């Protein structure tokens, strides 16, 4: 069965290029703020703080992701590249920035983080659609029913890229420019992100100790990433 061929999404608006990745990130932060605000207000708390927290998370997340990527690659110049929005770096940077903003507003981190738990899961699911839109973060070669080839991915899923950039072996007999079908791990993560959101949304009204729901999110997110890493093509497994 022939694999589905992926083509990246981009729209030129005058001098501005709007990419699927950019739209995915924008929607992720907007949806995250909406969900977190709704949870706080449902608990009878002031949700206005989430505007400041979201801005802090955006700035801290972007800086953390780029810095983490530069450390992984050993290239300080990677901070200025268009690539390198690494999840774990973004999560760490976003949390650090959010803690500072929350403390500045005189609120408790555990109180806000519980409201952010389902919001983070929803934002993650939506954000991964941005990775899909540009053809980034795909998986290992596969010829199954859901296999997808990325001839214009970031980077294209060619033999040369899979071997040189991701360290995969066993394809030396194929021409370097051969485009391989792979696991669409971006879509797997989107689906798992929505499952996490459904679980956390169901648990949001449970009266447990402050910080409990955020802890559940961390466990679910860790399990999700652990599982998907076995299918991802990237060579920075378990840390990227």
Predicted regions and their residues:
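A feature for loop-to-transmembrane-helix boundaries and adjacent hydrophobic helices
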Residues: 1-240
């Amino acid at each position: 069965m022939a694999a589905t061929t992926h083509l990246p999404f981009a729209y030129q608006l005058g001098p501005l290029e709007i990419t699927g990745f950019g739209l995915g990130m924008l929607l992720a932060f907007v949806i995250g703020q909406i969900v977190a605000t709704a949870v706080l207000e449902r608990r009878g708390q002031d949700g206005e703080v989430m505007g400041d927290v979201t801005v802090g998370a955006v700035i801290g997340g972007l800086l953390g992701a780029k810095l983490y990527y530069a450390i992984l690659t050993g290239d300080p110049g990677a901070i200025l590249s268009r690539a390198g929005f690494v999840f774990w770096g973004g999560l760490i940077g976003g949390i650090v920035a959010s803690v500072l903003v929350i403390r500045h507003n005189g609120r408790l981190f555990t109180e806000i983080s519980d409201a952010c738990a389902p919001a983070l899961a929803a934002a993650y699911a939506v954000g991964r659609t941005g990775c899909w839109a540009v053809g980034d973060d795909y998986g290992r070669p596969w010829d199954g029913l859901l296999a997808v080839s990325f001839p214009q991915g970031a980077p294209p899923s060619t033999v040369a890229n899979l071997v040189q950039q991701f360290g995969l072996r066993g394809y030396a007999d194929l021409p370097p420019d051969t485009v391989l079908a792979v696991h669409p791990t971006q879509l797997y993560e989107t689906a798992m992100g929505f499952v996490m959101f459904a679980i956390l949304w169901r648990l949001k009204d449970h009266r447990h100790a402050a910080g409990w729901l955020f802890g559940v999110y961390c466990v679910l997110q860790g399990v999700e990433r652990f599982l998907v890493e076995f299918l991802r093509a990237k060579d920075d497994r378990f840390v990227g």
